[in-house]
Regions:
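Multi-pass alpha-helical membrane architecture of UbiA-family
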Residues: 2-277
Length: 277
């Protein structure tokens, strides 16, 4: 009976840790990493690369909630296990260190190699530095820009000596779109809590404009690579809806466009980066 109860507690803790890691975005980034790695590596090696990315994303997600703990408690964020008291701080801190150590080992000694591994760790470091510092400054887009440019680049560098510029620019611009769209849903609570990054300083309207413009820029880049011209009018329509629809619909609309662009980015990357195994 005691063993069964202990197993249940351990399972509950694992599930709460996954919830605290911002599991949706973490899994999405991991999936994109795997899809980009498949043309360059055999499936088993691609899985190791995906695991390196997954452990890095866990670190970023957990440090985000650790840094925001007091603010989340003030706002009574019951959907966050740390803020609600369902998960102990020490447990998350310990899990973060374990995940970070695993990420370093998998990045440097796995298929990514030293060059690709260091670039990947640069991206992870940018994500963590955003949580601890940049989130509250007007330079808040910078870590996103660097991290999202590094993300596809590290996978390419594991097999090639250089990275296509279109992939670097598309990743960087998507990082800007991801940052501004991610902040939109919490714009007012962030301001009330004194979190004044670039989106909070510029305001909702300009943040929407930057997000929409970024998605259009990505669509133009992807169209030049994939020859799929439908992306550009779709991006313009999405940008129009950003301003016409109520604010509560803005984030789902942006994420829908982001998913479309990421899907095409993966397809374009696979087609142009394919190498014999």
């Amino acid at each position: 009976m005691h063993d069964a109860k202990s197993a249940t507690v351990r399972e509950d803790t694992r599930m709460r840790l996954l919830r605290t890691s911002h599991l949706g975005p973490t899994l999405l980034v991991t999936l994109v990493a795997y899809l980009l790695a498949i043309p360059l590596w055999r499936p088993s090696s691609a899985l190791v690369i995906a695991l390196a990315v997954f452990t890095g994303q866990l670190c970023i997600g957990w440090t985000n909630d650790l840094v925001d703990l007091e603010n989340d408690r003030t706002q009574r964020r019951k959907n966050k296990p740390l803020a609600s008291g369902e998960l102990l701080v020490d447990v998350v801190v310990r899990a973060t260190y374990i995940s970070l150590g695993s990420c370093i080992l998998l990045s440097l000694f796995g298929p990514l190699g030293i060059r690709g591994g260091l670039v990947h760790l640069l991206g992870v470091g940018c994500g963590i530095s955003y949580n601890f510092y940049f989130k509250r400054t007007w330079l808040s887009p910078l870590p996103y820009l660097i991290a999202f440019a590094a993300f596809p680049s590290c996978i390419v560098l594991s097999k090639k000596s250089s990275v296509p510029l279109w992939l670097v620019f598309a990743g960087a611009i998507f990082g800007i779109a991801a940052h501004f769209s991610n902040v939109l849903k919490d714009m007012e609570p962030d301001r009330a809590a004194g979190i004044l990054g670039a989106p909070q300083i510029l305001g909702t309207r300009i943040s929407l404009l930057i997000t929409g413009s970024s998605l259009i820029a990505i669509s133009i880049i992807l169209t030049s690579v994939t020859h799929k011209p439908f992306l550009i009018p779709v991006a313009f329509i999405a940008m129009l809806f950003l301003f016409l629809l109520p604010k509560k619909f803005s984030f789902p609309l942006i994420m829908t466009m982001a998913i479309v662009d990421v899907s095409v980015l993966v397809t374009a990357g696979a087609a142009s980066l394919a190498l014999p195994h």
